[in-house]
Amino acid sequence: MTGRMLNKHPDIFTFNELHFYEQLWKQQDQTKKINQFEAIALLNTLFSTQRDGYFHRKADEKYSSESERLITNLNGPSFFAHEIYKAFIEYEVNKHEKKIGCEQTPRNVYYVDAILNHFSNPLFIHIVRDPRDVLLSQKNRWKRRKFSGNTVPFQQTVRQWINYHPITIGKLWLGANNKISLHKNKPYYYVFKYEDLLMNSEKEAKGICQFIGLSFHDEMTKIPNVGSSLKQDKPGQLGIDKSKIDGWKKGGLNKTEIFICQQICKTTMIENGYELEKVNPNLFLLLYYYCIFPVMGFMAVLFSFNRIKNIRETIKRRFFN
C-alpha cells in the first residue's frame, strides 16, 4: 500500500517487488564478479520481474537487446551483481522520467547494511503493523489467487498455504522489527505504524515526504484498494481502507494463534504501543501447533529451495541475526 502511495508522487517510481537480495544475491556475491553473459541474464531476470511480474519472471531473452545496451554503459568485462542491480534501478527510474526509485521488497529489511554499501545515500521506510493482523493476513494469503482474479499461480498458492504457521509468522515479525533497534534514529531510517497511516493518511504521507525531501501531493492518498488477503480487489475504488485496523478482532484467528503470537512478540508489541489481549489457549491445539511446527518449517524450506540463492544464509538472517 505504501509503495502504491509513493508511486502517486510525480517524482517517484515504485518498482514491483524485485527480490534481488536473497533470491538473486547472497553475501558471497559481495566479492564475486560475474561475466557479461551472466550480467545480461541477471538483467533479463530483473526486466522480466518488473515488466511481466514477479510470478512470471525468468531470464527472458526478449529483453537481451535492452540488457546489452545497458551493459555497454558499464565498465566491463566483469561486474559485481549489485552493480548490475543498481544500474537497472537507475535505468528504470530515468526511463520513466522520475527522480527517485522505490524498491518495495519487504525482505530488504534483512539487507540494510548491504544496501547502504551498494547505494549512495539510500533511504529506508520501515512499517510496523500489529503482528496479529500480520498473522491474519498471512493465514489467508493463499486466497490471493481468488481475490486477484487468478493472477497468482497455483504453485504459489500452495506455497503460501504451507508457509503459514503462527510460530513462524510470529518469529518473522519479531526478527524484522528487531532490526529497528540497529538503525533507529539514523537519518536514513524512517519508522511509522501501519495503523497510523490508515487513521491519518495525509499526516503520515506528509511525514514520509518530509523524510524523503519532497513535497506532499493530494493524489498520494488516492490509491486503488488491491492486494488484500481478506477482500476482493477493487482497483476502481480509491482511498485508504481503514477497516484493515484490528481486523484480527473481527475473527479469522483462534485464541491459540493469538496466544502464540503474543507470547513470541509481546515485548516488541508493547514497545510499539500494541495492547495484549487476555486469551486462554486451547491446550490440545497449542500442543498440535508445536508438534507440526518442525514439519511445516521443513516443507516451507523445501518449497523455497529453487527461489533462494543460499537457504542457510536466509534462515540465519531472518531468525538469528
Q: PLM features: what roles do these ranges have?
A:
Residues 139-148, 177, 181-184, 210-321:
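PAPS-dependent sulfotransferases, especially Golgi type II membrane carbohydrate sulfotransferases
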Residues 1-12:
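A conserved segment at the C-terminal end of the G1
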Residues 17-103, 145-158, 162:
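PAPS-dependent sulfation machinery
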Residues 15-18, 218-220:
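Catalytic beta-strand/loop signature of glycosyltransferases that borders the donor
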Residues 17, 106, 129:
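Histidine-centered beta-alpha loop that forms part of the nucleotide-sugar donor binding/catalytic region
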Residues 13, 123-125, 190-192:
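Hydrophobic/aromatic beta-strand patches that form the interior of the parallel beta-sheet core
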